[in-house]
Amino acid sequence: MDSFNNNNNNNNNNNNNNNNINGEGITLRTLLNSCTNTSSNEQLIVNNVNKNSNIINNININNTPSPISTCINVNKIELRGSSNGIFLNSKIKVPLPNSTLLEQQQDGADEQDKKQQSLSDKNILFSSGDKEFLNHGSNNIITDQNTLLYQLQQQQQKEKEKENDEIMNHDDIIGYNEENEDNFFNEGMDPILAHSIEHHLHNHHHHHGEFDTQENEDTSGESSDESENIDEVLVYTEDIESEKEKKRERLITSPPSFDPHTLYSMSQSLLNCSLNNNNNNNNSISSPSSSINNSGNNINLNNSGNNNVNSNNNTNIINNSNDNFISQPLFNPLSMPNNEQYELLPNPTTTTSTITSTTTTTTITNLPPALPSFPSSSSIKSLKNSFGSNSITSSGELNNVFSSSMSPPMSPPNRNVRSLTFPGTNPINCINTSVINSITANTNCINHHHHHHQHNHHNHHQGHNNINNSGHIRKSADDTVTLSPTLSSGSSSTSSSNPHHPNHNHQKGLNNKTLEKLSCTRKEIYELIEKKESLIEKQNLIDEGYSENADSFENLSEEIQKINEKIIELENLITSLSNSNSNWSLNGSSTSTISCNPLSPRSMNPSSSTSSTSSNLTNSLRKFSQELKIELRPLDLRAELYSSINTSPRGSASISGGSGSGGGGNNNGCFKTSSNSSINSPIQFFENENESIDSYEKKNEEQFESLTQLIRENQLYTKPIEFKEIKLLEKLESNSKSSNIWQIEYKSTQLVLKQPKDQDSDKNIEKRKQLFNGSNVSGSNNSGSSGGNNHNHHHCNNSNGSNSEVIPSKYTMIQHKNLGLLVGWCGDSIIFESFKGMNSLHDLIHRDGLKIDMALFIKISKDIASVMGLLHSKDVAHGNLTSRSIYLDRFQIVKVSFPKLNATDLNNPAIEPRYMAPEMTRMEEDQISCSIDVYAYAFVLWEALTSHLPFRKFNDISVAAKVAYENLRPKIPTSCPLIIRKLINRCWAPLPSDRPTFNDILKLFDHLEGKLFFSSPGILWSLNNDQEVERELQKKERFNEITEFLRGKKEIKFDEVAIVEKVGAGSFANVFLGIWNGYKVAIKILKNESISNDEKFIKEVSSLIKSHHPNVVTFMGACIDPPCIFTEYLQGGSLYDVLHIQKIKLNPLMMYKMIHDLSLGMEHLHSIQMLHRDLTSKNILLDEFKNIKIADFGLATTLSDDMTLSGITNPRWRSPELTKGLVYNEKVDVYSFGLVVYEIYTGKIPFEGLDGTASAAKAAFENYRPAIPPDCPVSLRKLITKCWASDPSQRPSFTEILTELETMKSKFIKQLSFLNDLIQNPDDDYNNNLNYDEEVDS
């Protein structure tokens, strides 16, 4: 680590590799060159050999790792003949500018003893060599990196004149040295310099006699222990240049504001040459009081993670009657968010510490070079959005406006906002990066609490001072920091900020309304700049030969020019607001006023700046500055959109974006209002500060229900809307070539109306027929014709003949919360749900630079798949699934535009060529299906992942040909998760049959979200093909074993059975577990004892014993006294328990096997003319191999005369004909079978939410059935629907069911293999049949 230690004598430490530098005439360049030549484990020693011993100017910087940050401090120093001074609460003196004379003020021995006794807990004892001195740790002066750059510039200018300057050095340490007071002017002093100082003292006493009196009184007698800890330093400097007397009276301007490139480049350059980045360097420096520059700010920057950043802050005193009073360092990090103001409070308590010269210091890790640090989080009280100046209050609070970051507006956003603090450090000890510029020759006035005023005898703030900084910081449209206060002529007088001071005045700042207006104006400038950059990029693409939709970009140059004019207009507005509202007065009786620089950031003449460093940058520094622009991204753009969906709240975000419609335009229109077409910065788009995403989803569902209720109540699908019922709000901008888009209001609901530009009434009527399947549209024909003749206000008129009922179409049956709803029609115009406040995914990615993180990506992908699954279940293809037809609002709600009517029209396809499936390009009509949407879906996923337009370097014609005939696809980035890469490759497969369905895709994303198939918890029962074969063999072996044993046995003696325990009770019997001849058996003791004498019962039981089947519970025999039946005992439990009690989840193959086995068992029973009549999941049992066994059959037929209807069948599974008391046949079991299949697939109880009786009644008399999930395969959906048909003759037999299941099996296997391959197969994700575009940026 680098350590700068004070060498208190002239003895050199003759260690290995020592570098001895004579202190006479030392300059900054000499020092830096010497530091550059040092290496690891070297010691750099600078000896003070100047014989003038009355000037004490040594540096002590401790740089060792510790949770405590140590800063260099300045001892109180006073110029002879003056009682005025600059008060710095510290003890160590630092190098001051050329020709500056210093003297350490003498304190009496008794006063010194009092100070030693009254040290508060904020004092830290340092040991330097053989002497000790005190450091007030809570009032350290903080570094200022801008000033260091200015020092280097000034030093270069002064090198040619250094022979005219006299260097005064001293080799004593800073402390309470009684010999210093009388030896300030000695024989080695420059007489010109002495004359200048005396001249300045004369002016100073003349103008500030009040302060002389106050300080003399305070010096003669101090009344509090706190005031005794205050050190006083009075420093006067002159800028002695070659012009001598003429320039001696001129005021020295403050360091100029550096542009970001110069600031960071030169900081890094100094850092590399002065500190070497070597952790083991031990550089010991005792610096003379030689002049470094004319800025009073010294900076030590450290690029190592193990080094502390220490410095002190000296302030130049010009040769004038103005005094600068500094106590508290400024906290102005360079890269704080825009319009954010920290309110820093003094630390209420500090801890007493005694630290020697080996004290460790805070380490700064994981920071890029020259990255400023933030104040400690303990010092941050509140964060406010504001635009104003630094303010001061009597309570000691320090309000600072932090400057904006220096990266360009288009820098990639990083949404990870973190407070960069020093762990364990005092909030005062941080990097000071403020820059105070002065346009005129006046000085800044900085107030502090510890100045010894006449009425100030007590310190009420424990060393925490207020700073009245006159700098006004704002970020220009070019994203550079401008800190340029303009000081009017006159002397700035200072006063105490102590609340007891009689002349204390509160300063006045900008009012809240002006601040808010300034903030909004700045945001609008940033938006315009981002929009301009996007348009320039599009123009460049067109110039490179990319001609997609080139017609829509014809006026790009004009639009860019308009944006530039608008930016200038807004900057002028900022100027006027600043000039009219930003003046304020200093505290006390100051006559000086400070105002913002009236010049616009773009109109400022760079030649007026006193800094010319940027013009002298080398190529390497320019390159480095460009790298820093990327690395040091704007902190106001850092939000955690990437970490979580529920993060990155932006309360100030304001969406004024597209008011799109559900129907979309030619490109599914991202419609924008003509008044405002831009949105906020992309990372400020999403806003979910107070509520979670789930709550926004709930609101979306409520809005969806409200809109569907509006449609139902007004019968909008069956009758048109009268034009007089709607209100035209505004015409929306759209890329649609076929329609005019209007924002309308209907019954207090905002909607979108698409007015066709084509006045062909027949064509418009045909389109309306397709959407609404209207049987009576003649009434609106005339209105459609008149609409064309009467322009906008008559296009919705309809005649009185359009009141007849219209039959709903399949399009009116498509309703989903994530789909833009079809609302109705008015004349020839179609009305859709409005997407106001939403922006298309295309615009968010390509216009606003939004980066999609994985959590948001999965949400968008799943919502789209859910909508598309519903459309395909209705046999409707969307036809235009692109990033332009997908919309998002600030709460991450996804909407997909309404499907196109010409979705599969090969002659007039609705979709863009780069999203078009290859079979459409090849005009293969027999291959056109809903899978064209799956193909387009893959490109939407790719676009969201890469933030690039598909095939951006090809025109439309080239893309269509290369995709269709060369199988060209964009290259998927390797940073994309493997499972997503595989999914995309499957979706854009060349053959439609190889593409998955949206139901498969939806289940995949359910799995990625931690859910597999069903939301209910439980274990997954899976089955593969090998297990299926093995279990079939086991089932047959056990069945054959039992059959052989029972051959010839019909009756069992009850005393041959050992009853173990009761295991349950059913409708007809109590069930017990028993042991019979070594076999576990289920003993069902019938409740109706009269049955034992019924020969029919005995004959029925006998027939059951002979009818063995692997999927039917095996009957072992019966006992007449008492009447009971013996069956095999199945320890797997019932299917009802598995699905609804244990909540076991089933994979597709297990589902298929259960359904298939159940069909086999029921087919066997029906083949021997046996009806079950109580087929429910409770009567379906599983053995240890999870094989299906049907139980409790056959008895209902015998007991039909004795049992009530409710006892025959459970009401939930009861067929309508049984409920109605009609004649029935074996089809009652088919009805129940359909409900059991529904249970197996969904894991839900049939008619969930209704009791048994109500469900049976609604099923019989209202034809009510449970809702089949949209992700259910179409073939299985059709089978279930057939099985629970109201008409028994429409239900299939179990033989027909088995035939359908055999054809369905391949789809189940394909579904299983698709999911398993995506999740488990580690093979390469690339498709060998595809050619990947290597030119596409991945």
UniProtKB/Swiss-Prot annotation:
Residues 212-231 have a biased composition (Acidic residues). The active site is at 1174 (proton acceptor). It comes from the Eukaryota. The keyword ATP-binding applies. It comes from Dictyostelium discoideum (Social amoeba). InterPro entries: Kinase-like_dom_sf, Prot_kinase_dom, Protein_kinase_ATP_BS, Ser-Thr/Tyr_kinase_cat_dom, Ser/Thr_Kinases-Pseudokinases, Tyr_kinase_AS. The truncated N-terminal protein kinase domain lacks most of its classical characteristics and in vitro, has no activity. The protein kinase domain 1 is predicted to be catalytically inactive. Residues 482-500, 773-790 have a biased composition (Low complexity). GO terms for cellular component: cell cortex; cytoplasm; cytosol. This is Dual specificity protein kinase pyk3. The gene is pyk3. GO terms for biological process: hyperosmotic response; positive regulation of gene expression; positive regulation of protein import into nucleus; positive regulation of receptor signaling pathway via STAT; regulation of cell differentiation; regulation of sorocarp development; signal transduction; sorocarp development.
